[in-house]
Amino acid sequence: MVRLARPRSGHFDLGTGYHGDLWLDLDALFLRPSRLRPHVRWLGERLREHEVDAVCGPVEGGAFLAYAVADLLGVAFLAGYRSPGEATGYHLPAVHGGIGGWRVAVVDDAVNAGTAVAACLGELRGRGAVPVAVAALMSLGQASAMVPARLGVPFYPASTVPSRAWPAERCPLCADGTPVTT
């Protein structure tokens, strides 16, 4: 799966206030949806045991994947939209009757620093929903340990990819004078 995302090594601005040493072309993952079908099933099996009412996915990320998992599970799909002017803020559109009490899983294509899933979880909690899990095609770097510890929900990655990410202001590659890869 990682091969499909055409990985590149270097010094990258991840666009979330973080820098990292790995870039993945995540849009390339969705070029041939049938290749993801086994992974969608695997993610769905993990989330089914949480009896979710909905699956949420960040539109600038795993929304296509989240939609496929929601369809497989026969539950609602919630799109997380990036908030204008905020690097890491997301908002959900209004849902008739609200989502208070809904058990919701967040699904993303890849989790690195966790900013998108953290923002979606925060928005869900703010709306009264009960986040129960995060799932992703790929866990990058320390995300497999960080998500449960920092975000308080189980994390189900279909694969793990070695990489490193740092807050931009503490990036060792910047400190060493390594130019950002374009």
How should each PLM-predicted stretch be described?
Residues 1-182:
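PRPP-associated nucleotide enzymes
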